[in-house]
Amino acid sequence: MALYECVLIARQDISNAQVDTMGDEVSAILSEGGGSVSKREYWGLRTLNFRIKKNRKGHYLLLNIDAPAPAVHELDRRLRLNEDVIRHMTVKVEELEEAPSAMMQKNDRPERGGRRGDRFGDRPERGDRPDRGDRGGDRGGDRGDRAPRGERRPLREGAE
């Protein structure tokens, strides 16, 4: 039998339990065709990069499949008919990864906070900082008194 990876994106307005049921239905479809699901990962409700069928978010589900080609074709047909599935993609692979996917490893990292961290929270006191020196001069600081602008030409002829 061939090895496949399948990623589904389900509508944002269905519950986690319904997504889990959808995964069970996929397993049942494949077992009817003589295949099996070796790994199932729920990546959660994630924001889509662009709207798909009027949805801005979607439930992501990854499946590692060991099944013959006719079972995978039947799965593809049923996923196209399922209104809860926004998008799906099934790819044939050489071998299945047993380790958690990159998306799950990214979810295991601790939260880093915002882009600039916690501005006013547990920030250590910096104490007396030394003078940073002259900040003008070659950096364009105060240019002093400017010379007079002199006579200005009109922008277009006839205008004064």
UniProtKB/Swiss-Prot annotation:
It comes from Rhodospirillum rubrum (strain ATCC 11170 / ATH 1.1.1 / DSM 467 / LMG 4362 / NCIMB 8255 / S1). GO terms for cellular component: cytosolic small ribosomal subunit. Binds together with bS18 to 16S ribosomal RNA. GO terms for biological process: translation. Residues 106-160 have a biased composition (Basic and acidic residues). Belongs to the bacterial ribosomal protein bS6 family. Keywords: Ribonucleoprotein, Ribosomal protein, RNA-binding, rRNA-binding. The gene is rpsF. This is Small ribosomal subunit protein bS6. CDD domains: bS6. Residues 94-160 are annotated as: Disordered.
